[in-house]
Amino acid sequence: MATTGNWQSTSCILCSVNCGLQVQVEDGHFKKIKGDKTNPGSKGYTCEKPASLDRYQNHADRITSPLRRREDGSFESIDWDTAIREISGKLAHIRDTHGGSKILYYGGGGQGNHLGGAYSAATRRALEMRYSSNALAQEKTGEFWVERQMFQARPEPDFEHAEVSVFVGKNPWQSHGFERARVVLKAIAKDPNRGMIVMDPRRTETADLADVFLQVKPGTDAFVLAA
């Protein structure tokens, strides 16, 4: 990629909030990364994760080709055609011997582009798979179910204006929060007319800002909520 000093607008893909970013690219590397103040959602805010994007993309230890395990447990690099041929052959053998229902497809798109999940359709069809799953099955299905029971829809939480905010097993100060999470959390903590309740086995950065912190034992959160 040619050297450029111009700021380019884009968005972060490291969580579902997708904060707006501005980046400078030089010779295929991110030279500078900052929050995009013109983004109507994040308004220039970012957490620390985007600052590491160049390290993720260009780290010396990044795996750039398939690795095949040797008998001694070490790995050797192989080309993509070989990897696809060997893996597809083994999967086809499982299908022919035990049936496609014995193969579980797990995967999908990234946080910034979920179209990758659709690419699995041809593979699942060819292998006669019946079952599939992804990270949302663990992370979000319970949340979606509760929202449907309470609101008959999936509302977007308005923590910026809420009088009372409740976080159960969630630390938006660090990850997977909401737009301008740290700015909003600090504003809630400083406002005597607003409250924050955190329920978590671990005392997190968000818990340190809370008016009420319930440090429950793992597995007991449902009982606390029921009470």
What are these regions (language model features)?
Residues 1-227:
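N-terminal export/assembly segments and adjacent metallocofactor-ligating motifs
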